[in-house]
Amino acid sequence: MKNMNLAKCVVVLVITFIASMSTYAAKMNNNLIYNAEEVNGLKVSETVYKKDGNMLTNYMKYSYKYNANNQMTENMSQKWDANDNCWKNDLCIRYTYDNKSVTTEYYKWNSKKNDFILIPEMTVTMDK
């Protein structure tokens, strides 16, 4: 019986490994390379690079924030500006949780106001 459980675990591990490698290969075919940073098991940032021959160039950067329940509260994206050689804010998604629902609000960066501006028509509330 223990051998059967061990065999099942090995099969699951092999399938997971193959799926991970397939995902990695698919990302490589798109010429995008992903580099994630985790803290205490939570992804706090991810930088995406474009591959051009032997060169990697900055493309997108994502930052994530969480509440005390490890629920994502913010997902901010930035685009690389090659002219200014820096990251520029692009989009911010904020999540609000209550006992029965989660509300998702989308904000677009406004460089003139130097702030994220709510896009009200994209606000969505869903039951848990």
Regions found by a protein language model. Name each.
Residues 10-20:
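Bacterial N-terminal signal peptides
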Residues 5, 22-128:
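Buried hydrophobic residues that stabilize the cores of well-folded domains
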Residues 1-11:
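Bacterial N-terminal signal peptides that target proteins for export
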